[in-house]
Amino acid sequence: MEVRADAWAVDAACSGNPGPMEYQAIDLQTGARVFHFGPMRGTNNIGEFLAIVHALALCWQQGLHNKTIYSDSYNAILWVRKRQCKTKLERTPQTEKLYEIIERAERWLQTHDYRNPILKWETGKWGEVPADFGRK
Protein backbone atom coordinates (compact mmCIF):
# COMPACT_ATOMS: atom_id res chain seq x y z
CA MET A 1 0.00 0.00 0.00
CA GLU A 2 1.22 3.49 -0.85
CA VAL A 3 0.74 6.66 1.17
CA ARG A 4 -2.46 8.52 0.27
CA ALA A 5 -1.78 12.14 -0.67
CA ASP A 6 -5.16 13.53 0.47
CA ALA A 7 -4.31 12.91 4.10
CA TRP A 8 -3.18 14.37 7.37
CA ALA A 9 -0.52 12.79 9.56
CA VAL A 10 -0.71 13.23 13.33
CA ASP A 11 1.87 12.67 16.02
CA ALA A 12 2.50 13.40 19.68
CA ALA A 13 5.62 14.05 21.71
CA CYS A 14 6.09 13.71 25.45
CA SER A 15 9.18 14.44 27.54
CA GLY A 16 8.91 11.82 30.28
CA ASN A 17 5.96 9.59 31.07
CA PRO A 18 4.03 11.49 32.24
CA GLY A 19 5.47 14.81 31.24
CA PRO A 20 4.89 17.81 28.97
CA MET A 21 2.88 16.40 26.05
CA GLU A 22 1.96 18.05 22.75
CA TYR A 23 0.57 16.93 19.42
CA GLN A 24 0.13 18.19 15.88
CA ALA A 25 -1.16 17.37 12.40
CA ILE A 26 0.59 17.95 9.08
CA ASP A 27 -1.11 18.08 5.66
CA LEU A 28 0.69 15.54 3.45
CA GLN A 29 -0.06 17.46 0.23
CA THR A 30 1.26 20.83 1.37
CA GLY A 31 3.49 20.03 4.34
CA ALA A 32 1.64 22.73 6.30
CA ARG A 33 0.82 22.32 9.98
CA VAL A 34 -2.95 21.85 10.30
CA PHE A 35 -3.04 22.25 14.08
CA HIS A 36 -0.87 22.07 17.20
CA PHE A 37 -1.89 21.57 20.83
CA GLY A 38 0.10 21.75 24.05
CA PRO A 39 2.25 21.32 25.91
CA MET A 40 0.17 19.95 28.76
CA ARG A 41 1.02 17.30 31.35
CA GLY A 42 0.14 13.88 29.94
CA THR A 43 1.49 10.81 28.17
CA ASN A 44 2.48 10.09 24.59
CA ASN A 45 -0.42 7.65 24.07
CA ILE A 46 -2.95 10.23 25.28
CA GLY A 47 -1.44 12.78 22.88
CA GLU A 48 -1.65 10.33 19.98
CA PHE A 49 -5.31 9.59 20.83
CA LEU A 50 -6.25 13.27 21.15
CA ALA A 51 -4.42 14.11 17.91
CA ILE A 52 -6.55 11.61 15.96
CA VAL A 53 -9.80 12.83 17.55
CA HIS A 54 -8.80 16.48 16.95
CA ALA A 55 -8.14 15.64 13.28
CA LEU A 56 -11.47 13.80 12.94
CA ALA A 57 -13.40 16.67 14.55
CA LEU A 58 -11.72 19.24 12.30
CA CYS A 59 -12.44 17.12 9.22
CA TRP A 60 -16.08 16.80 10.32
CA GLN A 61 -16.34 20.56 10.86
CA GLN A 62 -14.84 21.27 7.42
CA GLY A 63 -16.81 18.57 5.56
CA LEU A 64 -13.65 16.57 4.77
CA HIS A 65 -15.26 13.16 5.32
CA ASN A 66 -12.90 11.26 3.00
CA LYS A 67 -9.59 12.67 4.23
CA THR A 68 -7.32 9.92 5.53
CA ILE A 69 -5.73 10.31 8.97
CA TYR A 70 -2.35 8.62 9.52
CA SER A 71 -0.94 7.83 12.96
CA ASP A 72 2.10 5.77 13.91
CA SER A 73 0.40 4.75 17.18
CA TYR A 74 -1.36 1.40 17.05
CA ASN A 75 -2.71 1.95 20.60
CA ALA A 76 -4.24 5.32 19.75
CA ILE A 77 -5.90 3.95 16.60
CA LEU A 78 -7.36 1.11 18.68
CA TRP A 79 -8.58 3.50 21.38
CA VAL A 80 -10.30 5.68 18.75
CA ARG A 81 -11.98 2.64 17.17
CA LYS A 82 -13.24 1.62 20.64
CA ARG A 83 -14.20 5.27 21.27
CA GLN A 84 -12.42 5.24 24.63
CA CYS A 85 -9.02 6.41 25.89
CA LYS A 86 -7.65 3.46 27.87
CA THR A 87 -4.92 5.39 29.67
CA LYS A 88 -3.60 4.32 33.05
CA LEU A 89 -2.52 7.88 33.88
CA GLU A 90 -3.60 8.73 37.42
CA ARG A 91 -6.30 11.38 37.69
CA THR A 92 -4.87 14.11 39.93
CA PRO A 93 -5.26 17.89 40.24
CA GLN A 94 -2.32 18.17 37.79
CA THR A 95 -4.06 15.98 35.18
CA GLU A 96 -7.67 17.11 35.75
CA LYS A 97 -7.72 19.55 32.81
CA LEU A 98 -6.32 16.83 30.53
CA TYR A 99 -8.97 14.37 31.74
CA GLU A 100 -11.66 16.94 30.86
CA ILE A 101 -10.22 17.10 27.32
CA ILE A 102 -10.13 13.28 27.11
CA GLU A 103 -13.78 13.10 28.21
CA ARG A 104 -14.75 15.70 25.61
CA ALA A 105 -12.91 13.67 22.93
CA GLU A 106 -14.62 10.44 23.99
CA ARG A 107 -18.01 12.20 23.95
CA TRP A 108 -17.29 13.47 20.43
CA LEU A 109 -16.43 9.95 19.25
CA GLN A 110 -19.60 8.54 20.80
CA THR A 111 -21.84 11.16 19.16
CA HIS A 112 -20.31 11.37 15.66
CA ASP A 113 -20.29 8.69 12.98
CA TYR A 114 -17.11 9.74 11.18
CA ARG A 115 -16.13 8.07 7.89
CA ASN A 116 -12.49 9.12 7.63
CA PRO A 117 -10.07 6.22 7.19
CA ILE A 118 -7.60 6.05 10.09
CA LEU A 119 -4.50 4.21 8.93
CA LYS A 120 -1.30 3.08 10.60
CA TRP A 121 1.73 4.99 9.34
CA GLU A 122 4.25 2.33 8.28
CA THR A 123 7.45 3.85 9.68
CA GLY A 124 9.56 0.89 8.52
CA LYS A 125 8.50 1.43 4.89
CA TRP A 126 7.95 5.18 4.72
CA GLY A 127 10.25 6.66 7.38
CA GLU A 128 9.14 8.85 10.29
CA VAL A 129 5.57 10.12 10.20
CA PRO A 130 5.64 13.67 8.73
CA ALA A 131 4.07 15.08 11.91
CA ASP A 132 6.99 13.77 14.00
CA PHE A 133 8.53 16.33 16.35
CA GLY A 134 12.04 15.01 15.63
CA ARG A 135 13.15 14.68 19.25
CA LYS A 136 14.17 11.02 19.43
Residues covered by each model-derived region:
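Surface-exposed beta-strand edges and their flanking turn/coil or helix-capping segments
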Residues: 21-23, 38, 48-50, 82, ...
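Short intrinsically disordered terminal tails
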Residues: 1, 135-136
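RNase H-like nuclease fold core
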Residues: 1-46
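RNase H catalytic domain
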Residues: 15-17, 57-135
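Acidic helix/loop or adjacent segment enriched in Glu/Asp that either coordinates divalent metal
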Residues: 8, 33-71
